[in-house]
A protein has these predicted regions:
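A short, structured active-site edge motif that brings together acidic residues
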Residues: 67-79
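Short His-Asn-centered micro-motif
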Residues: 43-45, 104-106, 153
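Short, electropositive alpha-helical surface patch
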Residues: 55-63, 67
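Short, well-ordered coil/turn segments that N-cap beta-strands
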Residues: 1-3, 36-39, 64-68, 99, ...
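Divalent metal-dependent hydrolysis catalytic cores, especially in the metallo-beta-lactamase
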Residues: 28-46
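Charged catalytic cores and adjacent phosphate/nucleic-acid-binding surfaces used
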Residues: 1-7, 11-21, 30, 52, ...
Length: 181
């Protein structure tokens, strides 16, 4: 079954970097439902623990209502060209499913797009960074490297969660993911 997932959000930042709480979870679950999507990936910068704690909290207090995939967004400096730095959203799939990696907002920071091993997807649409994504080039790169094309909100506030999403089978994420280190 395909799910509508916004796999690029910054919920910790949206709530001013406070610890996860039932009140925050209630607001996020309500936003997810109001946008007609099935779930989100939490990809705050350099903090995977917040998303993991948040997922546990949602599962405890709102079981079965939405999908939460914890992760983080990190910078990558390719060995081939350290000046072609880019950002990757790593999602830590539940139940030992491994790590699913998406190349975020291609063209930001560097206009050069280098695809390294263990990149599984690339954003073709990003609500806040769309202005520099060269969609034709991204589609071609995705085809060349067998990458999934993703759309994400890159929400840094509650109201933007779900403004972009990708319809995807969870099994497809699991099939491409690499084992967690």
């Amino acid at each position: 079954m395909k799910l509508k997932l916004d796999l690029h959000t910054h919920v910790w930042e949206a709530f001013n970097f406070v610890p996860p709480s039932v009140a925050i979870a209630e607001k996020v679950v309500a936003q997810i439902k109001s946008m007609g999507i099935d779930g989100i990936g939490i990809t705050d910068h350099h903090n995977k623990e917040w998303g993991m704690e948040f997922r546990e909290l949602v599962e405890k207090h709102f079981p079965g209502q939405v999908h939460i995939l914890p992760g983080w967004e990190i910078e990558i400096r390719p060995e081939a060209n350290p000046f072609a730095e880019y950002q990757v959203a790593e999602l830590f799939l539940p139940d030992g499913g491994g790590v699913f990696r998406t190349y975020c907002h291609p063209g930001y920071y560097s206009p050069e797009i280098l695809i390294e091993p263990d990149i599984h997807a690339i954003e073709i649409d990003n609500y806040i960074h769309n202005w520099h994504i060269r969609k034709d080039q991204v589609a071609e790169i995705a085809s060349e490297h067998d990458l999934m094309l993703m759309e994400g909100s890159d929400a840094h506030n509650l109201e933007n969660i779900g403004l972009r999403y990708t319809e995807v089978e969870l099994d497809d994420l699991y099939a491409r993911a690499v084992p967690q280190a």
